[in-house]
């Protein structure tokens, strides 16, 4: 089973949106999150979608799902106080859904994706699933096109080669058993943001 876990619990503070969180901003007649959800909803290998959302915006999201005929969303849950907590809550909801379908965590692949990032392709989703099937996890990366500067502990600066540098993107995909175990271990160790 392949489940997209979409986190959309942010309030858009960095973007300074006052009227609504950025995932619900209108873009050509649709909230941004709907474009993201359509990508996963239309993908033939995605079985279900879980969304972690700002609790007060859940009714609005439910209305938009009906309006734009997004059919694979099986759970909408209140997001957490941080992106990390929203992801964990989404993973727990994905686990609950998979278990309700008698599918184990070992058999379940989750694709963790940000609700405000609709600019991915069907091929990216397919590649993530295939790579998890092959090696157990996959983080979408693109080649770095700008110069990166890394500050060392002694304040010295290092400029790594662009040819050797990549930018991590979403989705980030895993076998559910691995990522939920990592989250639970980190929480047990008192690490809330990792």
State where each predicted segment sits.
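Residue-level signal for inorganic ion chemistry
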Residues: 6, 33, 90, 114, ...
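Hydrophobic residues at beta-strand termini and immediately following loops
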Residues: 27, 76-77, 168
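Conserved N-terminal catalytic core of the sugar/cofactor nucleotidyltransferase
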Residues: 34-107, 187-189
């Amino acid at each position: 089973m392949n489940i997209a876990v979409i986190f959309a619990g942010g309030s858009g503070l960095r973007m300074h949106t006052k009227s609504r969180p950025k995932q619900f901003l209108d873009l050509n007649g649709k909230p941004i999150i709907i474009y993201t959800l359509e990508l996963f909803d239309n993908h033939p290998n995605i079985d279900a979608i879980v969304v972690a959302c700002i609790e007060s915006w859940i009714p609005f999201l439910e209305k938009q799902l009906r309006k734009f005929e997004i059919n694979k969303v099986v759970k909408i849950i209140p997001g957490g106080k941080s992106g990390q907590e929203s992801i964990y809550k989404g993973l727990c909801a994905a686990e609950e859904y998979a278990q309700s379908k008698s599918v184990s965590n070992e058999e379940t692949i989750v694709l963790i994706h940000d609700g405000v990032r609709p600019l991915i392709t069907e091929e990216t989703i397919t590649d993530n699933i295939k790579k998890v099937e092959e090696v157990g996890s996959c983080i979408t990366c693109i080649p770095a096109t700008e110069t990166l500067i890394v500050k060392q502990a002694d304040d010295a600066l290092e400029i790594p080669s662009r040819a050797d540098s990549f930018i991590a993107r979403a989705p980030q995909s895993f076998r559910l058993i691995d990522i939920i175990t990592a989250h639970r271990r980190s929480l047990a160790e008192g690490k809330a943001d990792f």
